[in-house]
Structures are given as C-alpha cells and as structure tokens.
Amino acid sequence: MNHDFFYREWNWIEQLSAAFHVFAANIKPILKVLLIVFLPISILESIINGRMLNAYTVFQQIAQAGVSLSNEADFFQAAYQVLFHSGLTLLVGLFLQPVGTIAIAKMVKQFVTKQEISFGTALGEAFSLMPTIVFSGIIYGVLIFLTSLIIVPGIYLSVAWVFYVYAIGLSDKKGMEPMRYSKALVKGKWWRTFGYLLLLAVIAMLWNSAFQLSYSFFPNARIGNAVYQFLCYFSAAFVTVGEALLFLNREAVTYGIPTEPAAEDAPAESVAGTVEGEPTENEENKE
C-alpha cells in the first residue's frame, strides 16, 4: 500500500485504481467467499423471487378481474405471499449478505496492512459477528425504512450510513455505533462519497448487463436466475472492495488508526502496484 494511503484521503482515480488492483490480487479468496456464502444466497433468492413472482401474478390477475366474494380469499392469500416473500428478500439483504461483505472486507484489510491473507479466519470472524449484524441490521433497516418515507432523509442516510457494515466488521462497532461511526466518516464529504459510490455502481451495472447473457445458456428460468444472481454478486464483490478501501482510508485519515503495518513487515509491492522502498518525491528533492 502506498505510504500516504494512511495519511491522505485518496481521490476517485487512486481509489478506483487500488480497487481493481486489490480485487484482481485477491480473486481466489474472493471467489471462495462467493461460492461458500453468496452461491447459497443466490439459490435462496432465486426460489424466493420465483414464488413471489407467482404470487404477484395471481394477485394482479384477481385485481384486474375484480375482487369478489368468490375470489376474495385467493386475493388476500396472494397479497400475503407477495409481502411475505418481499420480507424474506429484505432479511437476506440485512442479515446474510453482510456476512460475505465483512469476510471480503477483512481480506482487503489483511491485504492493505500486509498481513497474510487468511480466507478461513476472515470468514470465521464474519460469521461470529452474526448477533451484531442482526441487531444493528434491524436498527438500520427500520430507520432507513422510516426515513425513506420522507424520501430526502432516506437518501441522505443511505449514503451517510454506507459504511455501517464495515464499522461492524473492521472496527468492532455495535448497536447504533456503526451508523454513527459511518456518518462521522462521511461528514463534510457526502457528495464526494455519493459520487464515488455512484461510480462503483455504474461499473457493477455494466458488468451485470454483460452477465445477463447467462440467461440464454439455461432453458430453466429458475436456474438461469440463480446463475445471474451469483454473477451479480461477483460485481458486488468488486463494489465491496472499493467501499472497504474507502472506509479504511477515511478511518486512518480521520482517526489516525494504526492501520499501516510496521515497515519491517511490509513486502516490496504496494496495493497500487508501486514498489516500496523507492525514494519518494520529497526524498529526491532533499537529495
């Protein structure tokens, strides 16, 4: 990692370049997380979405035909199924996906601090945080839902709290602390943060557009949907790397947290692909 990563906030180009480098350098352990955590989630989501679509189709057909005493029970049953499976999708996003996100983020931190990349340790620590993920996830979900009803506060907080999962996984925050910690890192930099998140989202959407071709290889819609969901998580893993790097950079610059490794432990190659030990511009000027 370039020395100034821990002392200066990087710009978008530096962050994005580092994100591609870290993602490529750790593709094997990231794929392991995808296979162990996100592949089962993809299959689960495919089942949930399939059932929700069926229920919604019935709901729509009855609504268009007109609700009467003869179909009233079916109408409310279909409505219940739509709401139930929508709730399941929300729970998966709040409680299961963060486990994989934290595992990848921990490997990013291991990489930038020049520690040995341990997939097993990262995944084990992520699973051990499940109680905190659930508790903080409930608080986050309820508050985001309530503020989203007013739209503008919901948009503001969704960006201000973007680091709440990383605060749980990388900084050991609990309860409301992850949201406060994230907001402190975004304070005064909301638009800059929003812009970078938008850039990551655009890259992920471009990848996902290419991944839509996977549907043509599977005649079974449910299997095709599961494969597509999994490939979308590949894009999401890149976004996670980008967000984790931004979090670590902001945290080190804001709080002076000793994220940087000892000089004797640092290998020659940096995160951005430069070689450590070469004279810096300031050192060359001194000479």
Label every PLM stretch briefly.
Residues 13-40, 119-146, 157-208:
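Interfacial aromatic "cap" segments that immediately flank transmembrane helices
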Residues 56-81, 118-138, 210:
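Long, highly hydrophobic alpha-helical transmembrane signal-anchor segments
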Residues 28, 72, 76-86, 222-225:
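Membrane-water interface of alpha-helical transmembrane segments
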Residues 34-53, 84-101, 133-158, 194-240:
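Hydrophobic alpha-helical transmembrane segments in multi-pass membrane proteins
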Residues 1-7, 14, 18, 55-70, ...:
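Juxtamembrane transition segments at transmembrane-helix termini in multipass membrane proteins
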Residues 5-67:
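Generic N-terminal leader segments that precede the first folded domain
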Residues 94-127:
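Hydrophobic alpha-helical segments and helix pairs
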Residues 43-64, 115-128, 156-157, 195-197:
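Alpha-helical transmembrane segments of integral membrane proteins, especially early/N-terminal helices
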